[in-house]
């Protein structure tokens, strides 16, 4: 990548939040890259970054499987900011003391600033932060001072300003830390001296060049679903290589109401792309029959997608690349070399080993909100750019347990009602994601003076910036009532509607 902008390097020590750090920095207009903790000091030096951030991680610095870094990184003279595990690693390196806490601290805590280092410039003396750690620093390294404390953590923040070294035991990158963004800003601008200079125009310019260099005169097959991610991928690649791109739209029977027709109209007629539609509904349902495990469903759907593309590509000439809408969040949720796996993502963990294509994933360094900005920059209509996030496995992971046509129809119809009412209420831009799910449980009800024993539909609606963390949406009661009444009255075999009020973490946004 041509770097005409300042860069902050984030070292990955296994935290599920590590890519959030890079995301927060990009929000400030400063480019940030995530790299494995095994990167060498020489490699970092060659990148000429303005500063380094050590992410958190699930391990203990004294554990057998502890992650370490090249100790020469501390000799580069660059500002370093250690978060959670990163602070503990810094402490150990400089001779301080790290011990196991009496109990794991997880959740919100009140932080008290004791020393206003550059990290805490213009921040309140007390603030709510997000803790998630099992070890803590109990003895400062020489030359360091305590910056902040909390009730359960006497050294919640530390610094050695002469060497430009900083550490915090909490997670400023998580939205629950109320002044976390300001704290990271203080490091990026106040300590590292960065200037704003990275934006989506830069990304488009670099990515178009990269796509052309990678593809050359070869042909690309794009998995087009009509969702935000695949739509942006298709338009971006089409802008780069034109008719060298062929889009395949697979109707696997797991789509939302009216989606198949909408995709063909928008991309084939609107964007004048070469789009081939494949009706694979029977093929997918046959493979998924009797399958209840969510991981197995994801793998089957991911594999079947690739096999469908293989079959179709065999009919085409010279297809070398498969384009996918894999995002940063897909990769982190599927686990990296250091991150613990939460769930397999259809764009990451579901690919067969004998796949015939080379992958091209131009969005795999972007978060969802960045993809929307990119889509707008590319001239994609708002109705697509602001479309609800929809997973590759589609309604297949919104029907919990075994998938049947009856269950799919329940989710499809109830989801259409939910989306219609949310839009009518003017909440479609306020709520980050909303959908219905079918948990597969039945309950007793009374309809028309008769006893019923039918399904329960779950509503999931969350507010978020990038999908890494999320809070349940406070939908007005009257809107929820309309949605519930319509679903129970208009969708067959449903007699109960429930609303999911769980945040992420501890839950994920999707139910499977």
From Swiss-Prot:
The active site is at residues 84, 171, 173. InterPro entries: Class_I_gatase-like, GATASE, GMP_synth_C, GMP_synth_GATase, GMP_synthase, GMPS_ATP_PPase_dom, NAD/GMP_synthase, Rossmann-like_a/b/a_fold. Pathway: Purine metabolism; GMP biosynthesis; GMP from XMP (L-Gln route): step 1/1. Residues 7-197 form the Glutamine amidotransferase type-1 domain. The keyword Nucleotide-binding applies. It catalyses: XMP + L-glutamine + ATP + H2O = GMP + L-glutamate + AMP + diphosphate + 2 H(+). The keyword Zinc does not apply. NCBIfam families: guaA_Cterm, guaA_Nterm, PRK00074.1. Homodimer. This is GMP synthase [glutamine-hydrolyzing]. It comes from Bacillus cytotoxicus (strain DSM 22905 / CIP 110041 / 391-98 / NVH 391-98). The lineage of its organism: Bacteria, Bacillati, Bacillota, Bacilli, Bacillales.
């Amino acid at each position: 990548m041509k770097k005409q902008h300042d860069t902050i390097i984030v070292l990955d020590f296994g935290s599920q939040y590590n890519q959030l750090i890079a995301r927060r920095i990009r929000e400030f207009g400063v480019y940030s890259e995530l790299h494995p903790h095994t990167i060498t000091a020489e490699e970092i030096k060659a990148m000429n970054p303005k500063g380094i951030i050590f992410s958190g991680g699930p391990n203990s610095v004294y554990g057998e499987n502890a992650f370490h870094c090249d100790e020469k990184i501390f000799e580069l003279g660059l500002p370093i900011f250690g978060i959670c595990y990163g602070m503990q690693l810094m402490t150990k390196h400089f001779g301080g003391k790290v011990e196991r806490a009496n109990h794991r601290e997880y959740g919100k805590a009140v932080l008290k600033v004791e020393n206003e280092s550059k990290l805490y410039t213009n921040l309140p003396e007390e603030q709510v932060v997000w803790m998630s750690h099992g070890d803590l620093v109990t003895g400062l390294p020489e030359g360091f001072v305590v910056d902040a404390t909390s009730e359960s953590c006497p050294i919640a923040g530390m610094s050695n300003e002469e060497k430009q070294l900083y550490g915090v035991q909490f997670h400023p990158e998580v939205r629950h830390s109320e002044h976390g963004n300001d704290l990271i800003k203080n490091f990026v601008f106040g300590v590292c001296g960065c200037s704003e200079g990275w934006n989506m125009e830069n990304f488009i310019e670099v990515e178009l060049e990269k796509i052309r260099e990678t593809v050359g005169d070869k042909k690309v097959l794009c998995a087009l679903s009509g969702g935000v991610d695949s739509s942006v991928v298709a338009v971006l690649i089409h802008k780069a290589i034109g008719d060298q791109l062929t889009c395949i739209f697979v109707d696997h029977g797991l789509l939302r109401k009216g989606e198949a027709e909408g995709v063909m109209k928008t991309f084939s007629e609107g964007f004048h792309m070469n789009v081939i539609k494949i009706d694979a509904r029977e093929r997918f349902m046959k493979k998924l029959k009797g399958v209840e495990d969510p991981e197995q469903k994801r793998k089957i759907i991911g594999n079947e997608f690739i096999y469908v593309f293989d079959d179709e590509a065999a009919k085409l000439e010279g297809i070398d690349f498969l384009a996918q809408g894999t995002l940063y969040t897909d990769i982190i949720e599927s686990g990296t070399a250091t991150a613990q796996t939460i769930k397999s993502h259809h764009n990451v963990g579901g690919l067969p080993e004998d796949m015939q294509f080379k992958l091209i994933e131009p969005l795999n360094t972007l978060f969802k909100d960045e993809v929307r900005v990119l889509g707008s920059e590319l001239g994609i209509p708002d109705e697509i750019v602001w479309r609800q996030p929809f997973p590759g496995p589609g309604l297949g992971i919104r029907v919990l347990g075994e998938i049947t046509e009856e269950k799919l129809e329940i989710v499809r119809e109830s989801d259409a009602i939910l989306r219609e009412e949310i839009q009518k209420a003017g909440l479609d831009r306020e709520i980050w994601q909303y959908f219905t799910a079918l948990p597969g449980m039945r309950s007793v009800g009374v309809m028309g003076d008769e006893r019923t024993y039918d399904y329960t539909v779950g509503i999931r609606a969350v507010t978020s910036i990038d999908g890494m963390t999320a809070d349940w949406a406070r939908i007005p009661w009257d809107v929820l009532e309309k949605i519930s009444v319509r679903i129970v009255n208009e969708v067959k075999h449903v007699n109960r509607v429930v609303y999911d009020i769980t945040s992420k973490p501890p839950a994920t946004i999707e139910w499977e």
